[in-house]
Amino acid sequence: MVRLACELASAHGSTLFLVEGPVLRPYVIYNLPKGYIDGIGTIRVGTQCCGRAVAQKRPWIVSDMLTDPLFADGRKGALDSPIRAGFSVPVLSGGQAIAALACHYMSPHTPSAIDIERNEVFAKLISIALRGRERTPVPEPYFAWPERVAAPSGS
């Protein structure tokens, strides 16, 4: 679903971060450079794009990571990679934000209303898929790149 969110929004990459107390931990990373993930550092609830979506329980857009003052905590990730913009929607369960689904772009970008609405639907499905996961620790994030997730030859 994370990959599908990326592809349908014409994004370069996408992420699913899980809420773990006051911070978000990477769970699934699709087609993003490790330098970007390392550079954004620990995402606290209420900071950066995903943390603000979780805190506000609504979509959050960062159209240009290099100029948006609300992305200051993650600017190193943008400087250390080609990623420049993103938008995030909260994944809600029982009225609580449990994760954030985000799409990332290589140039300044503002998503369309349909891209946001589609990701909100994906977030509902992800919420259902994550039910019961609260009792297990967040594993190391799963990094995926298109060549690693391509269909087998002959398909």
Predicted segment positions?
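Helix-loop-beta substructure at the N-terminus of cytosolic sensory domains
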Residues: M1-Y27, I37-D38, R133, A151-S155
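Amphipathic alpha-helical regulatory segments at dimerization interfaces
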Residues: V2-L8, R52, G77, L125-I128
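Short loop/turn motifs at secondary-structure junctions and domain boundaries
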Residues: E7-L8, I43, D68, A78-I83
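Short coil/loop residues immediately preceding or within conserved phosphate-binding loops
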Residues: A11, Q48, D73, G86, ...
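Regulatory sensory and allosteric helical modules in signal-transduction proteins
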Residues: V19, V23-Y27, G35-P69, D73
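A short, aliphatic-rich beta-strand micro-motif
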Residues: R84-L92
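Amphipathic alpha-helical "output/dimerization" segments
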Residues: S93, A97, P111-R131, P137-W145
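Short beta-strand-to-loop transition segments that serve as allosteric relay/switch motifs
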Residues: A100-T110
